[in-house]
From Swiss-Prot:
GO terms for molecular function: asparagine-tRNA ligase activity; ATP binding; catalytic activity, acting on a protein; nucleic acid binding; transferase activity. The keyword Ligase applies. Its EC number is 6.1.1.22. This is Asparagine--tRNA ligase. One of its GO terms (biological process) is asparaginyl-tRNA aminoacylation. One of its GO terms (cellular component) is cytoplasm. Belongs to the class-II aminoacyl-tRNA synthetase family. It is found in: Cytoplasm. Its main location: cytoplasm. Keywords: Aminoacyl-tRNA synthetase, ATP-binding, Cytoplasm, Ligase, Nucleotide-binding, Protein biosynthesis. It comes from Clostridium botulinum (strain Alaska E43 / Type E3). It catalyses: tRNA(Asn) + L-asparagine + ATP = L-asparaginyl-tRNA(Asn) + AMP + diphosphate + H(+). It is an enzyme of class 6 (ligase). Homodimer.
Length: 464
């Protein structure tokens, strides 16, 4: 059947199709039939909403159609008719229905509410449910919006390597990449694994960040961004952590921390506004069934200025508040999610930049402040999530950077190329990392990172 019309186009350009014959193809979401007529709700994947098809016993295959299981695929030819007195604005009165593919009667997604936990166990089918159809469409639109924002600003999209020989975060929580025989690896004289015999001739891992490579390109193209998968071997079984996730990492030359925060705020507002404009039906669904205050919160974010406070000031606020925390607050601690959410949800009641963190809890590449105790770093905290963006001005002074690496026991020879950037026309520069899944959680109101990534990879889970 040619000249099929997408359901999205029928909804967006209804007047063009009313009282005319249309062809659609899709999957049956619901079907109910009597002896003389029946109703099918069909979804073709192009739009969040279904379209109703009415069919009667004038069809030659009426009985066969009446007994079709949920999720069977069909093609329909019929007339689009307005239904002003019904729940749906229009319906298709079928003249012909062709069965494209039968579904088994044991199809797991019957017409009832399923828990997110259950849907995770059938990740190959959950995109067909309302919640995940909405989630992954928002994910797609948000990804496009990110590229659109940076391209409109003249940024160069840069592909950084997935396999790396350096640890950007210095945390050591990395997935090793090796072709050595795990049963009998070659050893050095000291009894350690001899990685010179490995595929790359050295110890290599999956990347935790593309930032170090991105800095190389920022110092050539001025403004660049990366957008790709990253990997952390953290054994954190929480709703906010995954072993594989996507990161957006811009780097900007001739820029300081203030420039970095302004870019982060502009980008976040742009992406949220773009999704609100392009996915109104999906966001209305989330607002009704997932997070009752979602639309109000998103509108507030887009229309208000973000707050800013230093780490020291944030600690003072937390110490003086009446709220009991599970983790004690004192200067020098890494703020926990409960602290971040109190600041952004209860105290400031808006997104919040926290700046100038103690150097001990931040990465080696962050620029040392004049007090020699804090670094020019920032975390953007948002209501409902906590930290969503981490950024900093990078340390451009070679002697300071080398001293910091020595403090942390990092070998200069592992980062020789990164250090060499400081020798050839170095300038102040800054950047940040945005966890894409946390952004999707924020935009949709979904509370578990496993539910905003198609096939989540978490400790003990690599199914599908």
């Amino acid at each position: 059947m040619k000249n099929t019309v997408l359901i999205k186009k029928i909804y967006r350009e209804t007047d063009q199709f009313l009282s005319k014959e249309v062809m659609i193809s899709g999957w049956i979401r619901t079907l109910r039939a009597s002896n003389a007529f029946g109703f099918i709700e069909i979804n073709d994947g192009s739009f969040f909403k279904n379209i109703q098809v009415v069919f009667d016993d004038k069809l030659g295959n009426f009985k066969e159609i009446s007994k079709l299981p949920i999720s069977s695929s069909i093609s329909v030819v019929g007339t689009l008719v307005a239904t002003p007195d019904a729940k749906q604005p229009f319906e298709i009165q079928a003249k012909e229905i062709v069965i494209e593919g039968m579904s088994n009667s044991d199809y797991p997604l019957q017409k009832k509410r399923h828990t997110f936990e259950y849907l995770r166990s059938i990740a190959h089918l959950r995109p067909r449910s309302n919640a995940f159809s909405a989630t992954f469409r928002v994910r797609s639109v948000a990804a496009f919006a990110i590229h659109k924002f940076f391209q409109e600003q003249g940024f160069v999209y840069t592909h950084t390597p997935i396999i790396t020989g350096s640890d950007c975060e210095g945390a050591g929580e990395m997935f090793r990449v090796t072709t050595l025989d795990p049963k009998a690896p070659e050893l050095t004289k000291e009894g350690n694994i001899d990685y010179t015999k490995d595929f790359f001739g050295k110890e290599t891992n999956l990347t935790v960040s593309g930032q170090l490579n991105a800095e190389c390109f920022a110092l050539a193209f001025r403004n660049i961004y990366t957008f790709g998968p990253t990997f952390r071997a953290e054994n954190s079984n929480t709703t906010r952590h995954a072993a594989e996730f996507w990161m957006i990492e811009p780097e900007i030359a001739f820029a300081d921390l203030q420039d970095d925060m302004e870019l982060a705020e502009a980008m976040l507002k742009y992406v949220i506004k773009y999704v609100m404009d392009e996915c109104p039906e999906e966001l209305q669904f989330f607002n009704s069934f997932v997070d009752k205050g979602l639309l109000e919160r998103l509108n507030h974010v887009v229309s208000s200025d973000f707050a800013k406070v230093t780490y020291t000031e944030a600690v003072e606020i937390l110490e003086k508040c009446d709220k009991e925390f599970d983790y004690d607050v004192s200067w020098g601690i890494d703020l926990q999610t409960e602290h971040e959410r109190y600041l952004t949800e209860e105290h400031f009641k808006k997104p919040l930049f926290v700046t100038d963190y103690p150097k001990e809890i931040k990465a080696f590449y962050m620029r040392m402040n004049e007090d020699n105790k804090t670094v020019a770093a920032t975390d953007l905290l948002v209501p409902g999530i906590g930290e969503i963006i981490g950024g900093s001005q990078r340390e451009e002074r070679l002697d300071v950077l080398e001293a910091r690496m020595a403090e942390l026991g990092l070998k200069k020879e592992d980062y020789w190329w990164y250090l060499e950037l400081r020798k050839y026309g170095e300038t102040k520069h800054a950047g940040f990392g945005l966890g894409f899944e946390r952004l999707i959680m924020y935009i949709t109101g979904m509370t578990n990172i496993r539910d905003v990534i198609p096939f989540p990879r978490t400790p003990g889970t690599s199914e599908f």
